[in-house]
A protein has these predicted regions:
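Glycine-rich beta-strand-centered segment in the early N-terminal region that forms part
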Residues: 50-64, 77-127, 132, 155, ...
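Adenosine-nucleotide cofactor-binding segment
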Residues: 202-211, 216, 221-281
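Conserved beta-strand positions in the Rossmann-like core of class I SAM-dependent methyltransferases
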Residues: 96, 230, 293
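NAD(P)H dinucleotide-binding glycine-rich loop of Rossmann-like/cofactor-binding domains
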Residues: 120-209
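Glycine-rich phosphate-binding loop and adjacent beta-alpha segment
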Residues: 276-349, 372-384
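C-terminal hydrophobic helical "lid"/dimerization subdomain
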Residues: 2-5, 11-28, 236, 325-384
Length: 384
């Protein structure tokens, strides 16, 4: 446990999301866990989901992955969010109701919802299937104003039910374990998208910086694409774990000689580290026309990159943000075909605050997943 984390209020206290800006109260009441302030920790809540419209899919949530961004969001570390806030954007469950205009989903289907639940649907990015880069801003799965529903604040997947527009619902293949599939909707697509953008295939060499929730998925996906994979880590204790995941090589990145030995050996690097670190040694491991994709989002500035390194080898330095809906479905189908899933530890609602502390401490292999069956029943309040 992190002794610096504020002590939350008693978990027996249930708070209803009946404040201005919460979702309309005409639909199902869902039990949930969320934060009521930066200092509250996660506590039981009751959230009122909207009544499904003609394009909506109502989902009984079975599992929801815990993402490190959930910690930042609920604790107000990136910005002051609208409280109460129910996090969770790695949702897997079963369809319970569909709107009259929904044809692709039926009651009982296993489905998923990722990091966004809507976009403008009209800009060039949206029309190209890149909703994550919507020029007007996509609607996040939690903590975002939903302009198509009276600017109601979206509430996430640490709950028993959710209602989502059909365009942002994904089909989860039946041969994927539902708990292990949940993190694919964030960690999976976040690493799959840059690998696909670079057209990684058999014979390519992929470097993965960091071996956490994102890094372990990058290793698995790159191997499934036929690549030779090198893991860069600052910790010798992760060597065996990297090899167990399928890495062909493991390099201790703080060892200058080991990094020099890897010079010009990599085609593309997936950097998952969210703390400031010097990228120049990694650029030196890239071959001509190589690329480094930055996925981690450090809170502080990174050391400067040497332009000469980029120029002399025609290297690219790029970022990447999750993936569009079509590509996310492609990723799920790819994982089902190749037997790829996240390594997960399932937790109950009463373990969520401890799980957050363990995430901050890096004490998880490799993703936590909430079993929503452990959430308490919602309060019987028509106005919640």
């Amino acid at each position: 446990m992190n002794p610096g984390r504020p002590v939350p209020p008693p978990l027996a206290k249930t708070i209803s999301l009946d404040t201005a800006g919460s979702e309309p109260s005409t639909g199902v009441l869902a039990a949930a866990y969320g934060a009521t302030s930066p200092m509250s920790g996660l506590v039981p809540l009751t959230v009122a989901r909207r009544e499904p419209g003609e394009d909506d899919v109502e989902i009984a949530i079975e599992f929801c992955g815990l993402c490190h961004s959930d910690v930042h969001a609920t604790r107000g570390e990136w910005r002051q969010p609208p409280y109460p806030l129910v996090p969770g954007h790695e949702i897997v469950g079963s369809v319970t109701r569909v709107g009259s205009a929904v044809e692709d989903f039926a009651v009982g289907d296993r489905v998923g919802v990722g990091c966004m639940v809507d976009s403008c649907r009209e800009c060039d990015s949206c029309l190209e299937g890149l909703e994550q880069y919507c020029e007007r801003g996509n609607v996040g799965t939690y903590g975002a104003a939903d302009p198509r529903h009276e600017d109601a604040v979206t509430q996430g997947g640490y709950s028993t039910a959710v209602v989502v527009d059909k365009r942002f619902v994904l089909r989860v293949p039946g041969n994927l374990d539902p708990a292990a599939a949940a993190p694919l909707l964030c960690a999976g697509i976040t690493t799959y998208s840059p690998l696909r953008y670079f057209d990684v295939e058999e014979g390519d060499s992929v470097g993965v910086v960091g071996l956490g929730g994102l890094g372990h998925m990058a290793v698995k996906l790159a191997k499934a694409m036929g690549a030779e994979v090198t893991v860069f880590t600052t910790s010798e204790s992760k060597f065996d774990a990297a090899r167990e995941l399928g890495a062909d090589h493991v390099v201790l990145s703080k060892d200058a000689d080991a990094m020099e030995a890897a010079n010009r050996s990599i085609d593309v690097i997936i950097d998952t580290v969210a703390a400031p670190h010097d990228l120049n040694p990694y650029f030196r491991t890239l071959r001509l026309d190589g690329a480094l994709f930055q996925l981690g989002l450090p809170a502080d500035d990174m050391p400067p990159v040497s332009p000469g390194l980029l120029i002399r080898r025609r290297l690219a330095y790029a970022g990447s943000l999750i993936g569009g809906i079509e590509e996310t479905q492609e990723m799920l189908d790819f994982c089902a075909e190749h037997g790829v899933a996240s390594d997960v530890e399932i937790v109950g609602a009463g373990q969520l605050n401890e799980a957050y502390d363990r995430m901050v401490a890096g004490d998880v292999k490799y993703r936590f997943v909430l079993d929503t069956a452990t959430l308490q029943e919602p309060s019987e309040r028509a106005d919640a």
